[in-house]
């Protein structure tokens, strides 16, 4: 029996990333879940995907009153962990989360207050999440970053982290996705998933670029906007693979779609190491950064539309062992 672990699920992509690890964990494990519609839907409809565990729901610390929400979140996590330590199922010895710096802070020992949480694992693939990095740098014992991490974007986080650093060879999507069979021909009109973001996140205020209205003309659209997706929350990857293309403001959805072989137009100013890696490896990713882009919108959009018909010419991308790596670190065989 391994460490009793508290898993932090802050974003729908994090739920998918950690689901198998949770299934391989202990029945006494705990979940801290961010109360956002997509995360709640995934937990409520997670039979067969995500085991039922004692769960604490916490607010998303963004927008108006974000500091009050953050303080409430830290206090709630402290109480949750303290109660769990007294429930007779063993001490909580490890906390694992993706970008979950506030939980690391809550579980960190102080000179006046010891902590049973000996290991605090901070997983991240988002170099620009500087506020979370600053907290994690002082609170986490381990960090997991990809081999394609761009230190020039991380505000000095990796260079100054004094804990254990693990380098993941692959994207987060390589951990939880399984390649699906793609359509053999392009529909007429092309079937395209479109995802817009609400904004208001910790680090996305300077990254959002509106999707031009003309991008949606003449397409058969499946709407997957943030917090408004009407399909089964666990089947979004199937939707991505079964469509001809994707247009999105979300870097996470873009990365998952192209790993599944679906041509994707990312409309965003965001810079990430994993986006650079996908481009180097020839993934069907088309990027438009808005008015600041050196290329015309019409040219990028035309390339995307042409790319919908060229997926047969793509070589199958290699699938690195990121899943096995993460499992070995967090759920090693007894």
Predicted regions mapped to residue ranges:
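Structural motif
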Residues: 4-5, 91-94, 191, 244-245
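Donor nucleotide-activated moiety binding/catalytic core segment of transferases
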Residues: 71-88, 223-255, 259
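A nucleotide-sugar donor-handling region in carbohydrate enzymes
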Residues: 140-204
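C-terminal amphipathic helix plus adjacent low-complexity
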Residues: 305-334
